[in-house]
Amino acid sequence: MDNVAEMPEEKYVEVDDFLRLAVKFYNTLGIDPYETGRKRTIWFQIYFALNMFNMVFSFYAEVATLVDRLRDNENFLESCILLSYVSFVVMGLSKIGAVMKKKPKMTALVRQLETCFPSPSAKVQEEYAVKSWLKRCHIYTKGFGGLFMIMYFAHALIPLFIYFIQRVLLHYPDAKQIMPFYQLEPWEFRDSWLFYPSYFHQSSAGYTATCGSIAGDLMIFAVVLQVIMHYERLAKVLREFKIQAHNAPNGAKEDIRKLQSLVANHIDILRLTDLMNEVFGIPLLLNFIASALLVCLVGVQLTIALSPEYFCKQMLFLISVLLEVYLLCSFSQRLIDASENVGHAAYDMDWLGSDKRFKKILIFISMRSQKPVCLKATVVLDLSMPTMSIFLGMSYKFFCAVRTMYQ
């Protein structure tokens, strides 16, 4: 008999495909952001505990160094650099703490995403354009994550690289051993083998803070893109809705049945949005406060004479923070536009020949769409592109105040 080659089964997109990169960053810290049914070993929990201990220890050492430098009025620049690092660590710690505290809510959010996600069918997933949305998700998440990792490695490796060149290649007798983030430790590390373990512990703490910040943002991007996907599909179906009231005996009832299923879908998306804001609200608020302070402090540093390596590191820092805030505002604006588009689609559809009950349901859809949804930093702030202008204005005011103090 001839051997018949089996056709490989087509792999359909799942919710995990959107969340995979964010989950990987969390896993490198020893964190499962939501319940997966996979039982972790005790070593995974020990790894998380060691990461947190190292990060908290570094945070207190960094604060102690900052206090010591603030006592010396001549070290204003170093104080600004240290304060920017402290702000970044606080942002990373707050995001890690938020995801640990909100883990049950995060699990509920992922389960809701899985419930609403298109079924594993080529026709259904094509209707939602799932592959196209996944491609966009990968572009944003990989690009953003890559930029932050470049920023981290620039801060973590440049001091060691400079020391290696001066000591090994140029044979400078007075080559200084400089730590990546702060220069005060409870032990003496200079001209000692303790320099390398100390350097590793600071670099590891920086990685934890960076990954904590990255993972939270990537999770937000992945969830928001899926919600926008659902809104876009709903608007498309409404626009292409074919009224059957005058074309079939039970056409009016069939029209109402189909529209009711779309209304139920709309309600599910709205619930998904509410749950998303409940999970990410506090991290978004803390993110904006810390980012405004970071932009201010790094901006001040760039206006002062800096060495080339410091300038490059801080420029990467500034670009990363500004891009983070811009993307959050941009995604929220797209969410606003997509939710409003549902109301426009309800008006644009061919509803003139429909039943009266059908028209009443359409009115409710349009009325609900007049209140667009967006990312909410708790009740304090609704994110949108105008929020970016507010953020830049607030950062500039901080910048002017700090610059005046320096002068």
UniProtKB/Swiss-Prot annotation:
It is found in: Cell membrane. Expressed in olfactory sensory neurons in the antenna. GO terms for cellular component: dendrite membrane; plasma membrane. GO terms for biological process: detection of chemical stimulus involved in sensory perception of smell; signal transduction. It comes from the Eukaryota. It holds the Pfam family 7tm_6. Residues 1-40, 101-144, 230-278, 332-378 are cytoplasmic. The chain crosses the membrane at residues 41-61, 80-100, 145-165, 209-229, 279-300, 315-331, 379-401. Keywords: Cell membrane, Membrane, Olfaction, Receptor, Sensory transduction, Transducer, Transmembrane, Transmembrane helix. It is a multi-pass membrane protein. Residues 62-79, 166-208, 301-314, 402-407 are extracellular. One of its GO terms (molecular function) is olfactory receptor activity. Disulfide bonds: none annotated. InterPro entries: 7tm6_olfct_rcpt. Belongs to the insect chemoreceptor superfamily. Heteromeric odorant receptor channel (TC 1.A.69) family. Or49a subfamily. The atypical heteromeric and topological design of the odorant receptors appears to be an insect-specific solution for odor recognition, making the OR/Orco complex an attractive target for the development of highly selective insect repellents to disrupt olfactory-mediated host-seeking behaviors of insect disease vectors. Odor-evoked OR currents are independent of known G-protein-coupled second messenger pathways. Interacts with Orco. Complexes exist early in the endomembrane system in olfactory sensory neurons (OSNs), coupling these complexes to the conserved ciliary trafficking pathway. Odorant receptor which mediates acceptance or avoidance behavior, depending on its substrates. The odorant receptor repertoire encodes a large collection of odor stimuli that vary widely in identity, intensity, and duration. Forms a complex with Orco to form odorant-sensing units, providing sensitive and prolonged odorant signaling and calcium permeability. Involved in the behavioral responses to benzaldehyde and acetophenone. This is Odorant receptor 67a. It comes from Drosophila melanogaster. The gene is Or67a.
